[in-house]
């Protein structure tokens, strides 16, 4: 997983509350057994005028010109600003996969659904909770300024605006540690690979029948 320390990026505003995971990545795309390739179908039913299906090339589809991520001023955005209860609905991990593969590294909202919130950290995305009044001001600024960017300093736990204003945010210490070091669950486990191998060797020495294969 890519480490996260300081990130500066363009902000895209999604002025919707209660965006659920089926809106983030519709159910028909969950059939894939691969963990990649979901970025083109992020917000699929809002992003395109035609219905998408797995394996369909996005270049042949009809983009919705009114959807925020299709507007030229927000191309290349890596920070998504949105409203309360983002990521509600089913607990599909495909939702943060799609967001990350599109290019988002940071999500900012007044609140997130719990399971989605946890899944973001496990997939290298930083979800930041800010007060609703602060989020509302950020929406005004993003809409009023083309090319609006923010800097996210995770070690210091602040969002930095272009004028230098710092907006503090909270993050649980273990989640912060994992993001800063680029550790997902597998990466954390592999840090203890030597101990795991030693345990397995000791266990097999004491109980060799556990190593026998069934025919």
Swiss-Prot record:
Enzyme class: lyase
GO molecular function ontology, one term from the record: 3-isopropylmalate dehydratase activity
Designated name of the protein: 3-isopropylmalate dehydratase small subunit
Gene Ontology, cellular component aspect: 3-isopropylmalate dehydratase complex
Primary role: Catalyzes the isomerization between 2-isopropylmalate and 3-isopropylmalate, via the formation of 2-isopropylmaleate.
Self-association state and partner proteins as the record states: Heterodimer of LeuC and LeuD.
Domain of life: Bacteria
NCBIfam families the record matches: leuD, PRK01641.1
Species in which this protein is naturally found: Leptothrix cholodnii (strain ATCC 51168 / LMG 8142 / SP-6) (Leptothrix discophora (strain SP-6))
């Amino acid at each position: 997983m890519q480490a996260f320390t300081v990130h500066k990026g363009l902000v895209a505003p999604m002025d919707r509350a209660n965006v659920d995971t089926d809106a983030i990545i519709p159910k028909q795309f969950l059939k894939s057994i691969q963990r990649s390739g979901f970025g083109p179908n992020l917000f699929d039913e809002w992003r395109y005028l035609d219905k998408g299906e797995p394996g369909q090339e996005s270049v042949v589809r009809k983009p919705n010109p009114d959807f925020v991520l299709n507007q030229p001023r927000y191309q290349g955005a890596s920070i998504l600003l949105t409203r309360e209860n983002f990521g509600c609905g089913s607990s599909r991990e495909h939702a943060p996969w799609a967001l990350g593969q599109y290019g988002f590294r940071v999500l900012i909202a007044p609140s997130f659904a719990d399971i989605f919130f946890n899944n973001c950290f496990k997939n290298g995305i930083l979800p930041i909770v800010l007060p609703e009044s602060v989020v509302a001001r950020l929406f005004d600024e993003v809409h009023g300024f083309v090319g609006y960017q923010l800097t996210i300093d995770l070690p210091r736990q602040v969002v930095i605006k272009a004028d230098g204003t710092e907006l503090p945010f909270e993050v649980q210490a273990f989640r912060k540690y994992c993001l800063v070091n680029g550790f997902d669950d597998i990466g954390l486990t592999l840090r203890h690979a030597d101990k795991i191998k030693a345990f397995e060797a000791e266990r097999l020495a004491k109980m060799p029948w556990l190593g026998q294969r069934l025919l």
